[in-house]
Amino acid sequence: MYCYTLLKFSASTARTNKKLLYFCITTVNYHIVNYSLMKNLYQKFLASTGVSTDTRNIAKGSIYFALKGASFNGNTFAAEALEKGAQYAVIDEAAYQTSDKMILVSDVLTTLQELATYHRNTLKTLVIGITGSNGKTTTKELIKSVLSQQLNVVATQGNLNNNIGVPLTLLSIKPETDIAIVEMGANHPGEIAFLCNIAQPDYGYITSIGKAHLEGFGSFEGVIQTKGELYDYLKAHQKTIIANADNPITEALLADYHNEYSFGVGKGVNIAVQCLGTQPVTIQFEDASTQTTEEGERVLIEGFTDAPTVATSHLVGSYNFTNIAAAVAFGKFFKLSNEAIKRGIEAYIPQNNRSQLMQWGSNTVLLDAYNANPSSMAAAIDNLLTMSDEKKKVLILGDMFELGNYAAEEHQRIVDKLKNYEWEGVYLVGSNFAKTQSPYPQYETFEAFKEVFPTLSFNNCLLLIKGSRGMALERLIQVK
């Protein structure tokens, strides 16, 4: 009955969405053919120590999934995985099936994703989905830090937020896990919807929507549509959305949807927040009061039900205020005490080249070199302008990747923005910045700038180092 109904629904939409028809039919066939295999594989998973995808760090007793990439074939390492202690190896090429410990499937990646969803559906764990153009990982880590004060929480490791990372996060959930926070990334339309079908989030939050991955999305409108796929899923399943009431773009995605829990600096929100400072970011938060009408409808009213609480973070920059506010909102939604939320915010220390403030000789370095796009680059420059004038300000900016046809325009826009202010020094690194009309020194490659960097004199300066991941500008502070 399930298969017939789904196929009937798919056929009715064929004229308007052939891709959906194909997806539905192939999904049904996959379940029909592989249900018994999946059930058997899941029992093996429960008896294992977990999942491995890399023979360089195989966990003893794990199940090895032989994934493929542009330059590698995991099937070729299946025997090695077993030798190193894997209990089983899941492969999709019969030529490599040399042991009864090797499980042959039609596609290893699809099997990994199906296993993750199967596991997710056997548990009572609540799943939070996080996406956005900027701040996903920082927000995810803040939410984890807050909720972990009173709940058992697992979250995406680092930024493993793609079609492999999301399943791995789900498979790390234990029966005792209360909440799983799943970060979802995308650089093409449809990816967030696909990840939602795997993770099946109960709650969700979009951090921000900016000019990231324009090459894959085609336009800013494409970014909005794709990031909005998280809210589309939540609305279709009547799930709760945590919303930033001060963000007009994400608010527009909600339209008339009422199952939301909001935060913001204005009235008519569940959690009222206020930014008391940005160096570091200090937040004040308090519950907005509600009353219930005779019809049973909850109505937000003015006034507050508890005294304001203030938390001082280890983050800098106004752009991190909403990341912290979102973590506060999740804490309040899940009934954590204000003190627990405060502890969680103040316990989080940024790492991995994300808004890291560090001393480097007589200089202060704001290392924000994990990634960059036009929106986050402009925000970082704006933040530097608000920081103390006691130190001379220097910017070392690297190329912003994946902008496609927008690359020249967006890099020039950043240069034009810089020209509006006085700086002690500006250094532009990368082939895109090298093509701009700029009054500042330009270097075609990181290697070219690395040769010059040791000769530069920085004394009592405030340095902003920011660029896309491929630039790896954090290497500079290991050079001088």
Which functions belong to the PLM regions below?
Residues 62, 81, 115, 130, ...:
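Residue-level signal for inorganic ion chemistry
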Residues 442, 461-478:
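Peripheral docking tails and interdomain loops at the edges
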Residues 67-72, 350-353, 369-440, 468:
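Active-site beta-alpha connecting loops in nucleotide-dependent enzymes
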Residues 35, 41, 92-99, 205-364, ...:
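Acidic, Mg2+-coordinating active-site environments of NTP-dependent enzymes
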Residues 13, 20-114, 118, 316, ...:
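N-terminal leader/targeting and accessory segments in enzymes
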Residues 26, 30, 111-245, 249-258, ...:
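Phosphate-binding loop of NTP-binding sites
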Residues 130, 352-354, 470, 474-475:
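ATP-dependent carboxylate/acyl-activation modules
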